[in-house]
């Protein structure tokens, strides 16, 4: 009977749970799904991470290559994120060129990289005007069940913290790059951006970490990205219900709390990996 009601009136079905301050999956309104992270998942990448947020699963691989620095910024390198949402992860996606959600997510990740200064582009310059690193950050969703922005942001941060680059010098006589693979160092990850997403129901009720179904039924979504100092790096609000200043402040404070939880989880995994 309940399954039939959910099929015929999915929104009303959800409302009955929300009135009791809970959700159909058993979580409270402010409760996140179980979150796990593994780093170094792809042996052929320069850095990688696999993040699971409930059923939503994202893997990020970072590949470093050489390139000439931009003409207008000769002392900088590049960070190039790309998000792939293949049909493999959900029946809602089709084969072919990237769909709108994949493009929006890629742009969101690019904005997070730029606004948070997680990697300073100057740190990627090897020789000004001559040579710089390009970090290709490929994020692939393996299983889609909502809140892709949080999962991608976490996977990117974890993968960047796993990247080790070899020492590179320019031979003055030949003007060629010489790579010392025996001498590698970790990237200088300067900040720790963490995304926290919310769904709005009936224009007033906020829930955190929405599933795919909750996103579909909601009247709007909001993603807040904060750094380790509690500073706002990004705010992503793709239309939908408006929010009062008090609601936004509530989202900010919840995002700061979530940042501490995610940072603690990532630090524990990194420490265990580096002590192996």
From Swiss-Prot:
One of its GO terms (cellular component) is chromosome. The modification N-acetylalanine is found at residue 2. GO terms for biological process: RNA catabolic process; RNA processing; rRNA processing. It is found in: Cytoplasm; Nucleus, Nucleolus; Nucleus. Keywords: Acetylation, Cytoplasm, Exosome, Nucleus, RNA-binding, rRNA processing. InterPro entries: ExoRNase_PH_dom1 (IPR001247), ExoRNase_PH_dom2 (IPR015847), ExoRNase_PH_dom2_sf (IPR036345), Exosome_comp_Rrp42_subfam (IPR050590), PNPase/RNase_PH_dom_sf (IPR027408), Ribosomal_Su5_D2-typ_SF (IPR020568), Rrp43 (IPR033196). GO terms for molecular function: identical protein binding; mRNA 3'-UTR AU-rich region binding. SUPFAM superfamilies: Ribonuclease PH domain 2-like (SSF55666), Ribosomal protein S5 domain 2-like (SSF54211). Component of the RNA exosome core complex (Exo-9), composed of EXOSC1, EXOSC2, EXOSC3, EXOSC4, EXOSC5, EXOSC6, EXOSC7, EXOSC8 and EXOSC9; within the complex interacts with EXOSC5 and EXOSC6. The catalytically inactive RNA exosome core complex (Exo-9) associates with the catalytic subunit EXOSC10/RRP6. Exo-9 may associate with DIS3 to form the nucleolar exosome complex, or DIS3L to form the cytoplasmic exosome complex. Exo-9 is formed by a hexameric base ring consisting of the heterodimers EXOSC4-EXOSC9, EXOSC5-EXOSC8 and EXOSC6-EXOSC7, and a cap ring consisting of EXOSC1, EXOSC2 and EXOSC3. Non-catalytic component of the RNA exosome complex which has 3'->5' exoribonuclease activity and participates in a multitude of cellular RNA processing and degradation events. In the nucleus, the RNA exosome complex is involved in proper maturation of stable RNA species such as rRNA, snRNA and snoRNA, in the elimination of RNA processing by-products and non-coding 'pervasive' transcripts, such as antisense RNA species and promoter-upstream transcripts (PROMPTs), and of mRNAs with processing defects, thereby limiting or excluding their export to the cytoplasm. Belongs to the RNase PH family. This is Exosome complex component RRP43.
């Amino acid at each position: 009977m309940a399954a039939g009601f959910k099929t015929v009136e999915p929104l009303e079905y959800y409302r009955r749970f929300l009135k009791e301050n809970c959700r159909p999956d058993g979580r409270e309104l402010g409760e996140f799904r179980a979150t796990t992270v593994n780093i170094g998942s792809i042996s052929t990448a320069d850095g990688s991470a696999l993040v699971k947020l409930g059923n939503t699963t994202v893997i990020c691989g970072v590949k470093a290559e050489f390139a000439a620095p931009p003409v207008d910024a000769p002392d900088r390198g590049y960070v190039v994120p790309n998000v792939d949402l293949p049909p493999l992860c959900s029946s809602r996606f089709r084969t072919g060129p990237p769909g709108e959600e994949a493009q929006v997510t890629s742009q969101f990740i690019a904005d997070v990289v730029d606004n948070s200064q997680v990697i300073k582009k100057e740190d990627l310059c090897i020789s000004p005007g001559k040579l710089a690193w390009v970090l290709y950050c490929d994020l692939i969703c393996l299983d889609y069940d909502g809140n892709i922005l949080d999962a991608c942001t976490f996977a990117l941060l974890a993968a960047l913290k796993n990247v080790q680059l070899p020492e590179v010098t320019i031979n003055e006589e030949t003007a060629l790059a010489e790579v010392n693979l025996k001498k590698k160092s970790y990237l200088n990850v300067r900040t720790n951006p963490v995304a926290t997403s919310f769904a709005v129901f009936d224009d007033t009720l906020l829930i955190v970490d929405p599933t795919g179904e909750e996103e579909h039924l909601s009247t709007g979504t909001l993603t807040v990205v904060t750094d380790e100092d509690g500073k706002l790096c990004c705010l992503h609000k793709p239309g939908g219900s408006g929010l009062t200043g008090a609601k936004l402040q509530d989202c900010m404070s919840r995002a700061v709390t979530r940042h501490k939880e995610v940072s603690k989880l990532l630090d524990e995994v990194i420490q265990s990996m580096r002590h192996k």
